[in-house]
Swiss-Prot record:
Name of the gene: ispF
Keyword match Electron transport: no
One Gene Ontology term from the biological process aspect of the record: terpenoid biosynthetic process
Protein function: Involved in the biosynthesis of isopentenyl diphosphate (IPP) and dimethylallyl diphosphate (DMAPP), two major building blocks of isoprenoid compounds. Catalyzes the conversion of 4-diphosphocytidyl-2-C-methyl-D-erythritol 2-phosphate (CDP-ME2P) to 2-C-methyl-D-erythritol 2,4-cyclodiphosphate (ME-CPP) with a corresponding release of cytidine 5-monophosphate (CMP).
Protein's organism: Dehalococcoides mccartyi (strain CBDB1)
Keywords from the UniProt entry: Isoprene biosynthesis, Lyase, Metal-binding
Protein family membership: Belongs to the IspF family.
Known EC number: 4.6.1.12
InterPro entries given in the database record: MECDP_synthase (IPR003526), MECDP_synthase_CS (IPR020555), MECDP_synthase_sf (IPR036571)
Protein name: 2-C-methyl-D-erythritol 2,4-cyclodiphosphate synthase
Catalytic activity reported: 4-CDP-2-C-methyl-D-erythritol 2-phosphate = 2-C-methyl-D-erythritol 2,4-cyclic diphosphate + CMP
Length: 157
């Protein structure tokens, strides 16, 4: 078995869509990025790639590449899952945390788990997501951005 961790951060801006775990969440601001800026899914992808010692998402999906402009991060997660399978790895489970002051995410977590599990080809019971705040400290506390951390456990087949 191998373990990997992932981290991602994106800035918030008015007029952008907020997508977390593949779920569009109603909010006056969204995350800025080349793809859909899904900070949670990006952290999960990095944790999976790290567990398999395959680099990070920037290596496979470089910002600025026109084919990834606005793409759903769930589609990228499917590609990462396929890459791991081709390299002989299976996903055991993923756990994650999103840090954001607003919006409150509790009501969206089950749907996020289902979307992420489907993209990874695993049971939703193997996907953990927690939501926390930064207690109004730092750039997250000022609602300038969001952060996500993830850890993945994979096995070699």
């Amino acid at each position: 078995m191998r373990i990997g961790n992932g981290y991602d951060v994106h800035r918030l801006a008015p007029g952008q869509k907020l997508v977390l775990g593949g779920v569009e969440i109603p909010f006056e601001c969204g995350l800025i990025g080349w793809s859909d800026a899904d900070v949670l899914t990006h952290a999960i992808m990095d944790s999976l790639l790290g567990a398999a010692a395959l680099g990070d998402i920037g290596l496979y999906f470089p910002p600025g590449d026109p084919k990834y402009k606005g793409i759903s991060s769930l589609k990228l997660l499917e590609q990462v899952t396929d890459l791991l399978a081709k390299k002989g790895f299976g996903i055991i489970n993923v756990d994650s945390v999103i840090v954001a002051e607003e919006p409150k995410l509790r009501g969206h977590i089950d749907t996020m788990r289902k979307h992420l599990a489907k993209a990874m080809g695993i049971d939703p019971g193997r996907v953990g997501i927690k939501a926390s705040t930064s207690e109004q400290l730092g750039f997250v506390g000022r609602q300038e951005g969001m952060v996500a951390w993830a850890v993945a456990l994979v096995d070699e087949k």
